[in-house]
Structures are given as C-alpha cells and as structure tokens.
C-alpha cells in the first residue's frame, strides 16, 4: 500500500510539473482561427445573401412560446432567437422575388414536460401543416420543393423528431424536408438524421448567465480534468449499457478515484467557475452526441475532450476542432488518463491560445442582441457559402419529387 501511494505521488508530481507552464494562469495570448473554409469566422454575411421570412400564423411560433416561456432558456432555444434575429437583420428582404433563401419559423421544440423536457410528437404534424400553408399561399416552395428553404430543427435528433435514437432512426427525416436545408444541433456522420448539406450549430447556452460567472483571467487552472453530469441514466437505462453507449459509465468506473479527475454527478453552484479552473473538460455523448458542455468549455477556455464517435461539430467547415479539442474514441475511455497526460505542454498551450480567440467564443453564442461573428452570423455565412443555387434546385413545370403521403400515418393527421 505504501509503495503504491509513493508511485501515485510521483506520478502526480511528474504530471503537474509537466503542465506547470499552463497551470499558472488562465490568461493566454490569442491565435487566429483558420478553419477548413478559410478565415471565415469574422466574415460579414451582409451583402452576400437575402432571406425572406415567411409570416406564419402565431400558432406556429409566438403563441407556443407564450404558453411556455421556459423555451427561451432551453438548450433548443436557437429556433426562437433565429426568428427574432432575422426579422431585424439587414439580410432580410420583404421582396421574395429577390430572396436567395426562404426561412420558415416553426417552433418544434417548445412543447415541454413539467421537468422541462421537449415532447416532439406533435412536431411532424406542425411542420407538415406549415409547409402546406406556404405551398398553398406562395409560389416559392413549389418551384423547388423546399430546396432553397431552411428550417431550424434543434431537437436531439433534428428533423427525425424523436428523443430516442432507435425510434428516431426508424422515423427518419420528415419526408417533406428532404430537399430543404436543415439547421440543427444534431450531427453524426453516416446517420439517417443528418442529411447532406445540413448546417450543424451549437446548442443554446444563455450568454448573460455565463458572463455573470466569469472569474479573473489570471486564476490558475488547478483542475486537470473536470466533469459534472450523469454517468448512468437509471430511469431510462437500468442496466447501464445503452445510455451514452457506456462511455459515461466507463469514465466513472475507471476514474472515480483518480485524483487527476474531478468528476461527479453533483452540479455545484460553482460549476461555471470550476470549468474556468480546469485544463480539460469532458464532453461525452449522452442520449445524443452533443450537449451544451461543448459551448461552456469553449466560452471558459477549457479544452473540450470530445467523446462521441463520428460527431459532426458546430460550423465544422469554419472551425478547426481538431486543433482546439481532444478527440477520444468511445472504446478508448479506459485509457483517458494516459491519453491526456501524454499531451505535450506546448500542444495544450496552443489549444488554449486558440480557445482564447474572441471570434471562437462568439461563434458559439446566440446573444441578444446579435453581435458580429456570433452563431446567427455563422449560420448566414454557411447559407451564403451554398450560393448560387445549382440549376437542379429548380423543378420543371409540373415536376414533383416529394411524396406528400410518405411517413408514419400519425404524421398525416391535421394539426
């Protein structure tokens, strides 16, 4: 026992001496972000596209929010704030004939349980109803069957509209949205709920709340690995092998007693402050591969350790996530301590410099009011990069590609 304790002390001293260079302070010089699409985070979309916003009856959006204002602070709130942003954005046009894109403001995630969980079961019928409305009252949907339209679908599995992955896969993306561009938080390669051309965005995290918890920049990062959240979802996965594909359970079982890992199910009032004192923040998958932890880690300069195989991260065509985060395969979770302690200090320092770049943080947020370079502008930049539309977008007279009667029978009922 004494020998193992000595070995542990030696390892701890060795580890923390090797990271002393970046443990002293949270303050780091910034480094310019250069994404795979070029230096685009600071691009201004104004003048590059025009968006027409459909004026739908309030039952599709505003009345739903009036019924439950909690939706404003939910991690799916991007669908609400996107509409508000576009209504006052200089890219908006009131003349649909000059529009490059058409936006359909439908709030599909604002039907919440008493515990604040979204119930997406009515969403397919609501979406079908909205599409039928615009197809009947404007000519623009019918000329492309939605190929120059975009929708914000921020639910767990996007436009598959189910919170359980197996059932979401069985449903697939709503057939009427097959040609539209989907703006969604869900992103996983080779998954039926992420179609080609979708724009993956960060989940909503309240900017003002995070701002109010900032601590002095020179505060030491004295926590090596930090995580707060569920390891087991006993209520929905009693045997523990399905939730997070076992990755969270593996974190707990392997590292609950490791002094380098500050992990717990308890969510302290100092959660945001603790993230600012940490070097690495675990961002494992849950029921879906994404969560607000990624946004929080970036905002607080904590290197995100992404444990979610095949995840597609927000604005991946503009942000060099490989340079900013650490990716760990789900099967390699038992070796997490070795992986993280093996990263050279100079690599960690560079990741911290990239995270310190204000444009990186801004791209993760949906602030009110909007600010240059924020997530709203990154969505518009993503849409602008798709222009001009290919000729194949426009259908020949009388041509029909979508099947209006496809999908589950329950989805065809009037809403």
Curated annotation (Swiss-Prot):
Organism: Arabidopsis thaliana
EC number assigned by the record: 2.4.2.-
Family: Belongs to the glycosyltransferase 47 family.
Subcellular location: Golgi apparatus membrane
Pfam families found in the cross-reference section: Exostosin_GT47 (PF03016)
Function noted in UniProt: Involved in the synthesis of the hemicellulose glucuronoxylan, a major component of secondary cell walls. Probably involved in the elongation of glucuronoxylan xylosyl backbone.
GO BP: cell wall biogenesis; cell wall organization; glucuronoxylan biosynthetic process; plant-type secondary cell wall biogenesis; protein glycosylation; xylan biosynthetic process
Protein known as: Probable beta-1,4-xylosyltransferase IRX10L
Lumenal side: 23-415
Topology of the protein relative to the lipid bilayer: Single-pass type II membrane protein
GO cellular component: endosome; Golgi apparatus; Golgi medial cisterna; Golgi membrane; trans-Golgi network
Segments traversing the membrane: 2-22
Cytoplasmic side: 1
Source taxon at top rank: Eukaryota
Keywords for the protein's UniProt record, in alphabetical order: Cell wall biogenesis/degradation, Glycoprotein, Glycosyltransferase, Golgi apparatus, Membrane, Signal-anchor, Transferase, Transmembrane, Transmembrane helix
Main localization, broad class: Golgi
Consequences of knocking out this gene: No visible phenotype. Slightly short inflorescence and reduced fertility.
Entry comment describing in which tissues the protein is expressed: Present in the xylem and phloem, and, to a lower extent, in interfascicular cells. Expressed in the root tip, shoot apical meristem (SAM), xylem cells of roots and stems, and in the vasculature of roots, cotyledons and leaves.
Signal peptide: none
Gene Ontology MF terms in the entry: 1,4-beta-D-xylan synthase activity; glucuronoxylan glucuronosyltransferase activity
Sugar-modified residues: 142, 403
């Amino acid at each position: 026992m004494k020998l193992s304790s000595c070995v542990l002390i030696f390892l701890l001293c060795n580890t923390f001496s090797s990271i002393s260079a970046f443990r002293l302070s949270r303050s780091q010089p910034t480094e310019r972000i250069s994404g795979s699409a070029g230096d685009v985070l600071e691009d201004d979309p104004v003048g590059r596209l025009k968006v027409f916003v459909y004026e739908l009856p309030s039952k599709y959006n505003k009345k739903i929010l009036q019924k439950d204002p909690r939706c404003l602070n939910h991690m799916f709130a991007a669908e609400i704030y996107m509409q508000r942003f576009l209504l006052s954005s200089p890219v908006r046009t009131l003349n649909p004939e000059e529009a490059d894109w058409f936006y359909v403001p439908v709030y599909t995630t604002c039907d919440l349980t008493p515990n604040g969980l979204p119930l997406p079961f009515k969403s397919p019928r609501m979406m079908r109803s909205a599409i039928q409305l615009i197809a009947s009252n404007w000519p623009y949907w019918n000329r492309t069957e939605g190929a120059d339209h975009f929708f914000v679908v921020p639910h767990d599995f996007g436009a598959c509209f189910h919170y359980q992955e197996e059932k979401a896969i069985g449903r697939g993306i709503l057939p009427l949205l097959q040609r539209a561009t989907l703006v969604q938080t869900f992103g996983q390669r080779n998954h039926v709920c992420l179609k080609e051309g979708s724009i993956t965005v960060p989940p909503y995290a309240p900017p003002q709340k995070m701002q109010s918890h900032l601590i002095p920049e020179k505060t030491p990062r004295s926590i090596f690995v930090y995580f707060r959240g569920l390891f087991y979802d006993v209520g929905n996965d009693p045997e523990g092998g399905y939730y997070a594909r076992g990755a969270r359970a593996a974190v707990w079982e392997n590292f609950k007693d490791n002094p380098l890992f500050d992990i717990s199910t308890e969510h302290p009032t100092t959660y945001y402050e603790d993230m600012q004192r940490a070097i690495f923040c675990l961002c494992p998958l849950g029921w879906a591969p994404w969560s607000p932890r990624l946004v929080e880690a970036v905002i607080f300069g904590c290197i995100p350790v992404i444990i979610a195989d095949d995840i597609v991260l927000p604005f991946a065509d503009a942000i060099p996530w490989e340079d900013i985060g650490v990716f760990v395969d789900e099967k390699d979770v038992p070796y997490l301590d070795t992986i993280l302690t093996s990263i050279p200090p100079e690599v960690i320092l560079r990741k911290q410099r990239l995270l310190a770049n204000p444009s990186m943080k801004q791209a993760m947020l949906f602030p009110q009011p909007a600010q240059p370079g924020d997530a709203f502008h990154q969505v518009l930049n993503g849409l602008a990069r798709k222009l001009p539309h290919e000729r194949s977008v426009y259908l020949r007279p009388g041509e029909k590609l979508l099947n209006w009667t496809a999908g589950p029978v329950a989805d065809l009922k009037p809403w």
